Every structure is written in C-alpha cells, then in structure tokens.
C-alpha cells in the first residue's frame, strides 16, 4: 500500500479517531487505526474498541491500493512532528510502515488488515435525522446521572425513547435520576406516514464521546441509524458507532414521586454559588475522614445552607419562596450541584416530602415543548 495525504488535513481528521482506541487490551489490533486505501481518491480510517468505533473518509492519492493497521498513538504523534505539506504512507509485504514528509522518514511495524475485528454494519433501514444542538442540549441535562459500574447493566448508559415527534432521554445511577424530553422535528417516518416509535440504551462512555462530537450550531444535523445491537451516528464526514445495551430499562415513571407536600422556588445560580462555597468544606480531603454532606434547612422564606467537616464549617442563607412545613434535609453536595448545573433555568422548583424521601428539581415555569426533571435521594443525617 502506498498513499499520499495532506499532512495538516489528515492530522486534523484523525483526532476524533482516538475516542475509540483501546489502551488496555491484549488485542494489539484495536490499539491501531485500520487504514483502507482500496477506493478511488479516498481512504477510510477506522478505530474500534469493541464497544464503540469511529470511521472517517479522507482525500488521498492512491499510488498502490491496500489496507493495514498502524498503531494509533505512534501514527498521530508522527504526523504532529512532521513538517512537510504532504505525507506519504507506504506499507510493504513485511508489514513495515514508512511515513515520509519533507526530508523526514519514520518507520514502524504495522499489522495486516485481516487481524482487525469485524466492524458492525454501519447502515440500516431504521434511521432518523435530528438537530445536533437539540441532542447535545439533552445530553447536557442527563449525563451527570449516568452510572458507569452498576450491577444492573441497563443503568450504565442513557435511555432514549422516540414517539409522536418527541425525544426523551433518561439516566439513573440509583442515587439520582435525570429526565429530559423535547418536541422537535425528527425527519423520517414509517412507511404508512406515522411517527417513529422505538427506544434504546446507549453506554455511558459512548454518550460522553458523542457529546464531544456534536456541535451547538442549530443548522447542523445528525443522522442516526439503529439495528438490534448497534447505533450509528453520521456526523458530517464522521461515522460514530456503538453497541447498544440490551435489556429492559427501569420503570422510571413509577420511581418518580408526585405526592410531595413541601415546595421551594429558588434562584438556581444563587444556590449553586452557595453550594460551591460549601464544597470547600464538604470536599476537603482529610486522612481518615469521609466527605461530609451539606444540610439544607427550609425555614419560612429562608434557605439555610450549612456543612461541617473535620477541618471547618460553613454557613450561608438565601431568600426563597416556600410552601408547606419547615424541613431539614441533607445531600451529597456534589450530586446536588451537578443536578442544578444540568438545568439552564433562572429559577427552579424543589419538591420535597421528608428528610428521607427523594426530591424533584424542575423548572419553576413549565414549557409546552420541553420537559426536564431531576430526582435526588437525600443522605441520612447523624443524630
């Protein structure tokens, strides 16, 4: 194989490929980039860590068609230090790769393309199109509540449901739950013209990488394809794909309480600022001690925030709108901050029942075309 590439263009193009490189594997092939130069004037580059993968297509002058696997880290580092305008990549019959640019020559071992694991089929009949900014904003609201190492596999990801032109995302790690739904234009319908209806669970790591790839530009879209075990995101010139988590997701509607009797409307940014100050105490690392919690006392039209640790204490208060009896309740401070930062509302409404039952955090003003809800379990206070 021998191909010639624009060095700056290829250096920029290969950066997203690194999201699917496995750093801890006994399989050397998935530590590399599969370069396939069997087409005309283009070559494809693929990375796949057996859970998620990325494929890009780049312009190339194909001198000798072929395919090979080159170590991803070494390839990217070599491109970065080369100085010529173009890079020539040659792989001989002994799988020795040679990278030339300007007067510089770098050689490294490669692997035959046949050793690369089978990549899932990247196009299926079931697909739809949605705005990148819409999907990215939804991920912003639910990413903080995803589990990564829960004994229940379905919680180690984000649940999505599409029905009647409405996209819903839900995440839960047993201590907190986040739910977001938007009514948006979803291109593609069923053959009879009806709206699409299906659900799927995307792994936590995949969601994190997808968030980095999506743009805030409202004009940009992402085309999504689904099969029984795989999801594919077509984002511009990139194809990002991942396995799906199999199984029935939790019945989150049953978990979310709607019988609260105590309500408080608070300024979100003001509360976050107060909790950030409390974090100086709750997140102190002291030998032999655990992180402390933050206490919230809803008393009349005041919210009193306090925390005590081995090295100090903090107190703060702010004005709120309060309905119901007074209540003292405690939380993991970081969890509460993450919950509030996931929203972008000026004011949020906190619904409570007791010091031992979960709270709901929602926008103070409801919207017709969107919905968001954050549920958080309190921590038990020492007597």
List the predicted regions and their residue ranges.
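Structural preference for solvent-exposed beta-strand-turn elements
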Residues: 1-383
